[in-house]
Amino acid sequence: MRYTTDIKKSPPQLLKTFAVCDISLYDICDYNVTRDQCKELGCCFYKGVCYKKVVPIYVQMFSTLIVLVTGIIIITIIYRIVQEIKRQMKLSMNSTPKASKKRSAFRPFSRDPSRAPSRSPSRTSSTLSSRSPTTAPTTAPTTDPATDPATDPATDPATDPATDPATDPATAPPTDPSENPP
């Protein structure tokens, strides 16, 4: 039995499977070796010369591009997940009972009809006289005329010039033709 030495090779890499023997691209391994010795060195034998076997540049560029695109996709996914978590936390903080009580307690100019103060007096004379003289009567919050649609002159039909009979030319009293010279 003949004893052969085991040549330990490095584990094959993914790109090494694409390695080719392109003479114009590679360096020379050794000049004076046989084909078998060249293959043991992991090189490529071509026309009596042993060349190094490497991965072409286009394969390296393609693999780099794949790695970059994958990295960008992963970073984008992580960013969106973080933004979604922040948005959910913000919504959950806004919906806490304390925040909702604070929000509903302060509404100085509410347009909600159920909360709007009425224009008629809410207190009768009997409720005002039953108070002690040391307690000052409190007034109901008044609405701002600039924001209240009921007192807005632009929407008030009594002050609208288009419907006001005093300024309407169709209902204006006729003038005497002698007053207007031709």
Curated annotation (Swiss-Prot):
Membrane topology qualifier: Single-pass membrane protein
Biased segments, Low complexity type: 115-170
A cellular component term, taken from the record's GO annotations: membrane
Keywords: Membrane, Transmembrane, Transmembrane helix
Residue spans of biased composition, Pro residues class: 171-182
Region (Disordered): 91-182
Membrane-traversing stretches: 57-77
Residues in compartment: Cytoplasmic: 78-182
Subcellular location: Membrane
Predominant location: membrane
Extracellular side: 1-56
A Pfam match: TEX29
Top-level taxon of the source organism: Eukaryota
Protein name, as recorded: Testis-expressed protein 29
Organism the protein comes from: Rattus norvegicus
